[in-house]
UniProtKB/Swiss-Prot annotation:
Protein name: Zinc metalloproteinase/disintegrin
Residues linked to a glycan: N259, N279
Key words of the record: Cell adhesion impairing toxin, Disulfide bond, Glycoprotein, Hemostasis impairing toxin, Hydrolase, Metal-binding, Metalloprotease, Platelet aggregation inhibiting toxin, Protease, Secreted, Signal, Toxin, Zinc, Zymogen
Tissue: Expressed by the venom gland.
CDD domains: ZnMc_adamalysin_II_like
Subunit: Monomer.
Cited SUPFAM superfamilies: Blood coagulation inhibitor (disintegrin), Metalloproteases ('zincins'), catalytic domain
Native organism taxonomy: Eukaryota, Metazoa, Chordata, Craniata, Vertebrata
Length: 480
């Protein structure tokens, strides 16, 4: 049973205005200093792991109380996650670290339905959270013998005075008609309930980025882990689980040529993935992170509609901002291109759009209605097979067998009897109009309404509720 802790952050808050401080996220002129004090409701011996599965943080922002509900991101790593560095003679040095007791969380702010939070508790609290439409960050202060943290708005981070940074994808580059037309489709709410998909990510860090962080592989690894945690959070809106499968740091030299031409570098990386990477590692989509400054202020590039293709399921992203969340948005943006999305136009609706061509002064964290339609069209028309398997459990790769009560690769439902009104026994696919075939939140081939109780609690525990977008009964993150 998940042990839920109530952790109260008792804050001594000191606003600093006019003075300046340098944090990992950049230079700040306005921030609040807070001193967290952890108070646990359970005896220390009752907590089996170093990091709890579910937590709550209570503290104040701008003098107002805030309660943050957090749940550990169980989908952050695939079951075969590995890290590889390279020796001076280019030999691979592999490691398979234990990542079950990791320190990365997702969450929300109580009484704010539109809030989001992504947090690392590895070395103090490092997080971003959105409340009332504004993005805040919290980071530890490097003050001797204290637990001081800084809380600040994203807008208070000093911005570089430079030309706008942008994606290198053009609307007519490697695109196809079905996704161009997708933003014009009228998609009903029922059609927008996306089937769950799983993307295993392989992240490669080039030698320039390794040098940028003074050869500190541990720092780079933590930075990448936090970025994937952010990507995972943003992709939840599309019911996509993104899990890190491979992290490679080119600590000695680049294994391909990375230059100022983003198209050239991307082409070389794609060819290398096809001929080398796929023979070594299991993954669905690979991204190369680099410190190289590309021509034309480009910070990323990816083929449109390339997901699962051996050469085109790739992206390149420049590590262009000290705030790792901003870089994670760029990584999500480029992966969005691989999933059939184009850049947002004026007619697209979202608060701050992930798929905007130019990096906004305001942090982007939402897919637009156009993106949702384009993604829906892409997975329907092209059915990328590699993202069907759940990387958190061993994949089943045998030939589909009717009625074995196990969804295998390529199946949408367990075939079973030809009389099943939801599942076509000949194809193991859902019948037209069906959203599901079985599950506690499936009723007459349709997802049950969000908020419907699907598992009644026992004792002092809490009920589980349907989420309206899947047939399974998700576990309530606030179980006792």
């Amino acid at each position: 049973m998940i042990q839920v802790l109530l952790i109260t952050i008792c804050l001594a808050v000191f606003p600093f205005q006019g003075s300046s401080i340098v944090l990992d996220s950049g230079n700040l002129n306005e921030f609040e200093v807070v001193y967290p004090e952890k108070v646990t409701a359970l005896p220390r011996a009752a907590v089996k792991n170093k990091y709890e599965d579910a937590m709550q943080y209570e503290f104040k922002v701008n003098g107002e109380p805030l309660l943050l509900h957090l749940e550990r991101n169980k989908g952050l790593f695939s079951d075969d996650y590995s890290e590889i560095h390279y020796s001076p003679d280019a030999r691979e040095i592999s490691a398979y670290p234990s990542v079950e007791d990791h320190c990365f969380y997702h969450g929300r702010v109580e009484n704010d339905a539109d809030s989001t939070a992504s947090l690392s508790a590895c070395d103090g609290l490092k997080a971003h959270f959105k409340i009332q439409g504004e993005m805040y960050l919290i980071e530890p202060l490097e003050v001797s013998d204290t637990d001081a943290h800084a809380v600040f708005k994203y807008e208070n981070v000093e911005k570089e005075d430079e030309p706008p940074k942008m994606c290198g994808v053009t609307q007519n580059w490697e695109s196809y008609e079905s996704t161009k037309k997708a933003s014009q489709l009228n998609v009903s709410p029922d059609q927008q309930r996306f089937p769950q998909r799983f993307i295993k990510l392989a992240i490669y860090v080039d030698h320039g980025m390794y040098t940028k962080y003074a050869g500190n592989s541990e720092r780079i690894t933590k930075r990448v882990h936090q970025m994937i945690n952010n990507i995972n959070m943003m992709c939840r809106a599309l019911n996509i689980v993104t899990s890190l499968s491979v992290l490679r740091i080119w600590s000695e030299k680049d294994l391909i040529t990375v230059n100022a031409s983003a198209p050239s570098s991307l082409t070389l990386f794609g060819a290398w993935r096809e001929t080398v990477l796929l023979n070594r590692t299991s993954h669905d989509h690979a991204q190369l992170m680099t410190a190289t400054i590309f021509n034309g202020n480009v910070i990323g590039r990816a083929p449109v509609g390339g997901m699962c293709d051996p050469k085109r399921s790739v992206a390149i992203v420049r590590d262009h901002n000290a705030i790792l969340f901003i870089v994670a948005v760029t990584m999500t943006h480029e992966m969005g291109h691989n999933l059939g999305m184009h850049h947002d136009e004026d007619k697209c609706n979202c608060n701050t759009c992930i798929m905007s061509k130019v990096l906004s002064r305001q942090p982007s964290y939402e897919f637009s209605d156009c993106n949702e339609n384009e993604y829906q069209t892409y997975v329907t028309d092209h059915s990328p097979q590699c993202i069907l398997n759940d990387p958190l459990r061993p994949d089943t790769v045998s030939t589909p067998v009717s009625g074995n009560e196990l969804l295998e690769a390529g199946e949408e439902c367990d075939c079973g009897s030809p009389g099943n009104p939801c599942c076509d026994a000949a194809t193991c696919k859902l019948r037209q109009g069906a959203q599901c075939a079985e599950g506690l939140c499936c009723d007459q081939c349709r997802f049950m309404k969000k908020g419907t109780v699907c598992r009644i609690a026992r004792g002092d525990d809490m009920d589980d509720y349907c989420n309206g977008i899947s047939a399974g009964c998700p576990r309530n993150p606030f179980h006792a």
